[in-house]
A protein has these predicted regions:
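A short, surface-exposed loop/turn module that caps and links secondary-structure elements
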Residues: 34-58
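Enriched for short, Lys/Arg-rich terminal
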Residues: 51, 57-86
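Short, solvent-exposed, low-complexity loop/linker segments
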Residues: 18-42
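Arg/Lys-rich, positively charged N-terminal/basic patches that mediate binding to nucleic acids
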Residues: 1-26
Length: 86
């Protein structure tokens, strides 16, 4: 997970200190999801199908600045990225 895999493994990642608890919770939700519909709750996830350069990906929000982007295939998330959208 490109430098943030430690978040999922309960390690502290200095770059993400301000969002680590929320990001960890969202990564766990993503890991546990059996379908995209599972990610619609809570509504704050704001599950979106992305377009443009990220066509084929989906995202859930960590906060107003950060999103977790991923490709959903065969009931699992692949190519997971924690992305600064600003």
């Amino acid at each position: 997970m490109q430098g943030y895999g430690g978040l999922f493994n309960r390690q502290r990642v200095p770059r993400f200190r301000s969002i680590e608890n929320v990001a960890r919770r969202k990564l766990t939700m993503l890991n546990n999801a059996q379908s995209l519909q599972d990610l619609r709750v809570p509504p704050g996830n704001r599950l979106e199908q992305l377009i443009g350069d990220r066509a084929g990906q989906h995202s859930i929000r960590v906060n107003d600045q950060w999103r977790i982007c991923f490709v959903w295939q065969d009931r699992d998330a692949y190519e997971v990225e924690l992305v600064d959208y600003h």
